[in-house]
Amino acid sequence: MEMNNYLSEFIMFYCQNSVETAKNYRRANKDFIEFTMNRQGWSMDELVVKANKRDVLYYIKELESRDISPYSINFYISAIGTFFRFLIEFEYRSSSNPCENVQRLDTDGIEQKQEYLEEYEYKALLQVIKTREGRQRKFEFTSSRDVLWCTLCLTVGLRAFEALNLKVEQFNSDIITIKGKGNKTRSFRITDEIREAFNEYMKVRNTVLIEGQEDEGFVFISVTGKQLHTKDINKNLKKYTSRANISKDISSHALRRSCVTHYLDSGVPIAKVAVLVGHSSTSVTQRYYKSTGEDFDFLGI
């Protein structure tokens, strides 16, 4: 069986609840498979049967040579281990999981940057997104779309995959229910800021659809009319922050962290914030928190 067949079946049964998780698990395992097949001269079927702990350790060394962070390498190990658990459970492989006794890399003492935006930075970011000379149709579309994305992520703390899965029809109501991490549902209210950004975006959303092209109904689409990917929005965020002279590595997740930080700084109870952003406990919310001592009253909650 070909690599893509194994990976597709794996994704179908193990990553069905999250498009982003599926993409990341597929990418990690595809990289490991291609590296190991090339190093060992194996076919895919041979790798399924023969891969062992030594192959995983060689791959870890390869990742380290690429300057991949310990946090990311540990994710790769986890993704590979999950793939081999699938192979064993579906009886493609009879031997043990090659990741079973692989020690995770030590991340103690390694500071992971927890970037977030101050209020003035968020306003500057939105201003850059909205303003540009010679506003062409393509820019009108991406600008309005990205303003809505930032507003949602910062106002209600959506995860990237939660925002990507939103459908246009859900905005017919003032309350939106989403399916989040672990398949758990939660709801949020559409604030005036969100409604205004959504209405502006809807004025231009359909301009990128080609005549006869099927509209899948996702709120966030690319310039080709297909469902947007996180990497595309994060790429845009990097450009926007650079133009706004914000010297931080801002991603969609950083906007979510900003949401948590600013609500807590504004005095919103941590239990309420945890429910809003879909955290399993307030201890998770606390890890997101970085006190700024400033208010963020313009969010409207």
Residues covered by each model-derived region:
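Conserved catalytic core of the tyrosine transesterase superfamily
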Residues: 1-301
